A protein has these predicted regions:
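Short, glycine/acidic-enriched loop or turn micro-motifs at the edges of active sites
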Residues: 22, 46-47, 66-68, 107-108
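Short, well-ordered coil/turn elements that cap or connect secondary structure elements
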Residues: 10-12, 33-35, 57, 95-96, ...
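SAM cofactor-binding core of SAM-dependent methyltransferases
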Residues: 1-51
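Short, conserved active-site loop motifs that form the nucleotide-linked donor/cofactor pocket
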Residues: 38-39, 60, 99
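C-terminal substrate-binding/active-site "lid" region of AdoMet-derived donor-dependent transferases
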Residues: 68-154
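Short SAM/SAH-binding signature in class I
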Residues: 57-64
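Short amphipathic alpha-helices and their capping/turn segments at secondary-structure boundaries
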Residues: 43-56, 85-95
């Protein structure tokens, strides 16, 4: 756990990682102790983002991977908080010069499969990107939506 945050910290000035599970949060805190560019926050993303997002500006990238997928991943009030996460991002888009939203595990966004019933379908994500004037595509197992003034990047 924490590999994505560590990788992002190689390129970004600051990385905020939100971990709802207490044990995983504590492991991440230990792992990133002494790294001033990685901020580990304990809580549910849908509760943390409303106060965190207004503090950000400039070029902002979001890696959304807070869905419950079994194993040690956290199961919150919903298996997939992406609807609330995207609403929070949408409410703050005007603050950012450029934005990229990456949503992992796109294969799970099929609510007709019983174990993914809490997930929105792909059309929800596409409509959200279009409504917010973002270019979107799928690469590997990741839905990518970003400001139209950004070059295409390979994941």
């Amino acid at each position: 756990m924490g590999d994505t945050a560590a990788l992002l910290a190689l390129e970004a000035k600051e990385v905020y990682t939100i971990e709802p599970d207490r044990a995983l949060f504590e492991k991440a805190e230990i792992r990133f102790h002494g790294n001033p560019s990685i901020h580990v926050i304990h809580g549910l993303s849908e509760n943390i983002l409303p106060s965190l997002l207004p503090t950000l500006s400039g070029t902002v990238n979001f890696w959304l991977d807070g869905d419950f997928s079994g194993g040690i991943t956290h199961q919150g009030p919903t298996d997939c908080p992406v609807r609330e996460e995207l609403l929070n991002i949408e409410n703050n888009l005007a603050r950012y010069d450029k934005v990229t939203v990456l949503i992992d595990d796109i294969r799970c966004f099929d609510p007709y499969v019983p174990e993914y019933a809490d997930y929105p379908d792909l059309n929800f994500l596409v409509d959200w990107a279009r409504k917010n004037n973002l270019h979107w595509h799928i690469e590997h197992d990741i839905f990518v939506a970003k400001s139209k003034n950004q070059p295409q990047a390979n994941l």
